[in-house]
Amino acid sequence: MTIKAEDLPYRPCAGIMVLNAQGLVWAGRRIKEGNSEYDGSPQLWQMPQGGIDDGERPLTAAIRELYEETGMKTVTLLAEASDWIHYDLPPELIGIGLRGKYRGQAQRWFAFRFEGDESEIQIDPPPTGHSAEFDAWDWKPMESLPELIVPFKRAVYEKVVAEFQHLSGK
């Protein structure tokens, strides 16, 4: 049986851009997973993101996901994107990526300033007992982010960078 993208919903998701005092953005390198949307891609750097639970507000999900994936708690909200940003999985990943249940994601993005000490950042393992999603992290120039993400998410990152560019201090 062939799964059609138009028969699947978008997964509601919160995306999180975290800037340090120098205006650089936190990015983590995804752990390679076989048979997933990251399988075989050399562009594995991304900002934290995660699903919004039923009944959960997007900002609450963003704060929860940020802590679950990175351990960061000492952050200040700077901005919220003006609208939801959608992406579709490429046809070859329909029925595989996002556990096969979604055609892509509808993301609500938030920008935060990291105010803590870098010792707060824990990715492997993260502090909540969840499985690690990243095997490395770094502070990246905001304008470099679209080139670091898997190609099918590049347009999302271009929109996020455009939305929050004024926060980088450049």
Curated annotation (Swiss-Prot):
The keyword Hydrolase applies. Keywords: Hydrolase. Residues 9-162 form the Nudix hydrolase domain. Its EC number is 3.6.1.-. It is an enzyme of class 3 (hydrolase). Gene3D superfamilies: Nucleoside Triphosphate Pyrophosphohydrolase. A motif (Nudix box) lies at residues 50-71. InterPro entries: Nudix_hydrolase (IPR020476), NUDIX_hydrolase-like_dom_sf (IPR015797), NUDIX_hydrolase_CS (IPR020084), NUDIX_hydrolase_dom (IPR000086), RppH (IPR022927). One of its GO terms (biological process) is nucleoside phosphate metabolic process. GO terms for molecular function: bis(5'-adenosyl)-pentaphosphatase activity; guanosine-3',5'-bis(diphosphate) 3'-diphosphatase activity. Accelerates the degradation of transcripts by removing pyrophosphate from the 5'-end of triphosphorylated RNA, leading to a more labile monophosphorylated state that can stimulate subsequent ribonuclease cleavage. PANTHER family: NUDIX HYDROLASE 26, CHLOROPLASTIC, UDP/ADP-SUGAR PYROPHOSPHATASE. This is RNA pyrophosphohydrolase. It comes from Agrobacterium fabrum (strain C58 / ATCC 33970) (Agrobacterium tumefaciens (strain C58)). The gene is rppH.
